Amino acid sequence: MTSEQEEVSILTLQVTFPDPELPPLSLTVSPEESVQEIRNYIRDAFVQERCITSFTLNLNGQPIDGFESLAEIEGLESGATIELTNAPYNEHEARLHVIRVRELAGFSNNSHAAVGQDAGMTAFNRTEGIDKTPKDYMQEVVETKAQKEAKAKLKAEQKKAKAAAKAEALAKNEEVSEDEESEPEDDTPMKQSTQVLEENSPMHGFKLEESKSLQELFPDRQNLPAPALLSLHLSHWNPPTQAQQLNGELLYLQCATLEGESYQIVAHTNGFYVANSTLGSFDPSPKPLMVKTKAKKQNGGKKGGKKTETEISYVPITTENMHHSLYDLLVSLSDKFAKKIASNYAELNAAGMLSVVPPTNCFLANPWLTKPAGFRRPDMARNQELLSLKNLEGQDDTREWSEDLQSLKELPRETINDRVVRERHLNKTYFDFTEAAVAGAVQVVHGEIQPINPSEPEASHIFLHKGIFYSVGADGSGTYAEIGGDEAARVASAKDLQAVQQLVQFDFPEIASLCTTVVDYQGKRIVCQSPVPGIFRQPENAPPQVKYGSVEGAEEIASEQEFGDAFKPIAAAFRLKTHTVKDANKEHSLHLASDCKGLAGTDGRKYLLDLYRLAPVDIAFLDANPSYPHQLALLRFEAVEAYFRHQVRAEIKKQSLDEDETPKFEVEPFYLNPDAFVLPAPKEDEDAVRAASEFVSNTIIPEHVEAVIAGFGTTPIDGQQLTQSLHGKGIPMRHLASVIAAAKKSDTSKAQFLAELCEQEIAVRSAKHLLRNEMAKKGANPKYVVAHVMNLLLGSTSKVFDTPAGLLAVSDSVNLSVDEAKAAVAAIAKTRFGYDLDTSIFAKRPVQLLRELSGKLGLQFLQKEYEFGAEPFAVADVVNILPVFKTTTFRSKLVEEALEAARNSVNTDKDVALQLLRESIPLAEQVYGSVNPELTKVYNTASYLAYEMDEALLAADLGRRACIMSERCSGIDSVDAILNYLNLSLFEHAIGNYVGALHMIKHAVSVWVTVCGTHLHPDIITSLSNAITMLTTLKRWNESRQWLEKTIVITESVANEKAQAPLRFQLAQTMCHEQQYKEATDELRRALKLFNAHYGEDDQNTKDCAVWLKSLTQAAVSIQRQKLWEQEQGRLARQAPKPTATHQKEAPKKASKKTKGKGKGKDDKGEKLVAELKKKKAGKR
């Protein structure tokens, strides 16, 4: 890139404000950024000072508002001045402004049905030995190549000057003190860590075998600071009449300040002012504005001089002098307002803003244990829907979700700015739909929304609310009667959602899919979808909307050519074969399953729905398990893709053997027929589907288990990670029994652990079905059902809770005994998984089962120590039952491409990779917002790349962000959070913060043991080895040895002898530092034996160990000879004449001078010997 291109790629702009107290804002931006992004930045940059929300931007007197990029604005050059002018409010802008001021004042609203108690909590602020506030990595952390070279040059010059000064001092026979020789004191992380570790070690006294108590698992609630106002909400004088609206009045507000004063405020098109209204009388006319001025008055003092005093005067309010910002008005009314906001921000900044900033595009994680409810501040605005963001964004009954979504999908994507705008709005729209759908589904379950077909059975009820179509996840119409009824209908909704999610990621421009969310709440499943445009407003004689697929089951099939051509790319992406289907009249050639429907919307777009059969039948599983509850067992998309690639590789290999030229063949013959074993199909299609189904059982499962056992795959920690790992390989969870069988073929500890975790997951999923069925029964009170069934499974009592008068009766589950409940779970396990479940697992792993069940059913329990085995749960212990949902989400391809480009440049051009990395982070934050689970992945990937590029400070900063984000979005005890803490320990170690690194490992491992239920997890050895390395670096030889010995014991239990060799080698080196040479020699012999057996004689580790053993043996002989010589010298000395008094006094002086400043004693000898051994090893190499 030339210098001219670099100059054009950056614009420097000045933004001026109408308020002279605000200095101009300097912006350094890219020409690709949009005007809207500049507007958003200004809103965020001045939220604490002024809360500017309604304004226009002008260049040379002309407005430049819009979504166009800066490069498209005529006359805009680097150095230009943009003038910001206040713009009149409308009702929408006024309400948005009030919400921003409320947020700034400290009011929050977490009343959504999916937001549980203590949602989004983090333990990061409670960890020790680490910086809690992430740095500005864009400016402070990342250094340019020139800066690094300049710093290295300066350091080299300083070192050279210091050496010259030392040489000069020695030449003059001047004594150089230890302080002069040592490095100057500093406050670097390494220096701090060393000082702290001399007093205490985080690993000291840590009992690995003991898991965290339930009381310690989640930290105490982090209460937000008190708001800067007593209240700020809509007044009861709302809404303004038509006549008042003509006067410019938009809203009426009521405010109470910390001083105890109450004000009635009018939101006007020109700003905000205090009205003459009171609680009992309405008068929107403005009160005179109280102004404090300074005037000189005659003072009657001794000297008779004049003194300046403050005088209060009242100025009439006009459209010219009213406050444009509500913030400014409140500052003038309350002296404590601005001070309290500044105090709150300082408190939040000290705790880390990332841990408290509210999300805009995601839901936060709900902990399964929560403290008793704390103090709740009164806030009238909580029940005022006018201040709801849902209404602000038009989420009312008339919103056309499908139209909004498809319009966004059709936005241009030619430039980076186009893609950022498109992806940000798509991500936000999908979340807005999910938010509205989950809230509506809860209302449906509570009976608060009337069905549009009330005369039909309850299972057939459908609802239309806020532009969203709701249906019950049951077979109310009999569509699935032949393949499993309600069970099949429930599964079909989940399969449909999976297919829609795949389509969202494929992002086909010509195909319109529906926003879809599936909500499970209190045992009931509600399917939420955006309606196809025009589906409820069809004229009487209009042609049928279904243009492709089944119209009325298999009796009538549609196959219009235009739709078929549009759907063909989708079939290729899903590896589906074009096949022939017969209806009552003729044959049809279909690319997708016959159950899929292509509809023509009234907006002219092609809509694709009913996608639950976009994968072939898992026929091998159904044949082997005839009692399975439904016939809708399909292959996962990952398995279809794996089988396709397997077939293509086999064909390539076959052709390569037959011909020398590059193989050329069509891949479509390797596609699968989705209607095979559903409708009549050719035998070759059925054989291909059966082969793919058997490929899962005979190839994918054994290979995955072997990979885990061999260490090439991760050994899962909990059920969620197990599910993700199996799904990633294309293994459905109904195959858990096959995974257990494959694992039990090996006698290794990894295989045993995998089998036990799979058995735990079978128990959890079977118990989930029992609890779900009991809660869904008519007349059941969910809270009582949960407490009762949990006591049956995790306790030993069938006691029935007394239901208070007025509440509905508990369901029939009260008739179950403990044995009957566990037998019911075992029966479900046999039916659904084909596995004979040992129900004693409920007594062996109660905490783990409670945690997993809570996550799958949305349960929150009171955080306390439960006495499992008796009657652990009371009704009051069930704090909350939350909706559990799966939904369509949009992942940014632009962000993924930026990170991939950075990854590919790491080894070729580090500066380019670093620049790409720096750009990808703000890009991701633009698309996803400040808080989002996708940001966790971005921070995690970016931190690793920075670590590989030796940008340790940047890696540590991003690692801290990943920890906070994963805790808030996935949970404090999630596997993501555990792994991110372990990764962060490496980054903290790289910057020299060993104390912080050890604290990270200690925290992660303690949560790991609690979640896993045992410290004998195969992968925990790596984390302990990292801790040992850190202790060794700090010369904590005794602790290093203790943890090495513990780790070797764990390795003997969960790993093979090969894993012990390097640990024993490291233990021997640690023993040398403690001068325990005999024990070190013994350990070296054991290590060398293991190295020879498992690594081979030619391996470098084997050679190094042999060198150490040989050198240590020789050193031991020398040490023994030295001891014998010293003993002989002592004997001769005792026989010689005694020295004079002078000699007796001089000898200690010489010895003292010799050892002056060393202060190492015994340890110094061990370190010298280790240094000699390392030198010999290097020489051998």
UniProtKB/Swiss-Prot annotation:
PROSITE patterns xrefs: CLU (PS51823)
Bias (Basic residues) ranges: 1150-1159
Pfam families, alphabetized: CLU, CLU_N, eIF3_p135
Segments of skewed composition (Basic and acidic residues): 1160-1173
GO BP annotations listed: intracellular distribution of mitochondria; mitochondrion organization
CDD domains linked to this entry: CLU-central
Subcellular location: Cytoplasm
Matching Gene3D superfamilies: Hypothetical protein (hspc210) (3.30.2280.10), Tetratricopeptide repeat domain (1.25.40.10)
Single GO term (MF): mRNA binding
Compositionally biased residues, Acidic residues: 176-187
Top-rank lineage group of the source organism: Eukaryota
Disordered as annotated region, ranges: 165-195, 1130-1181
Domain named Clu: residues: 379-622
Location (main, coarse): cytoplasm
One annotated Gene Ontology cellular component of this protein: cytoplasm
Known role: mRNA-binding protein involved in proper cytoplasmic distribution of mitochondria.
Subunit relationships: May associate with the eukaryotic translation initiation factor 3 (eIF-3) complex.
Family membership: Belongs to the CLU family.
Name of this protein: Clustered mitochondria protein homolog
Gene source species: Yarrowia lipolytica (strain CLIB 122 / E 150) (Yeast)
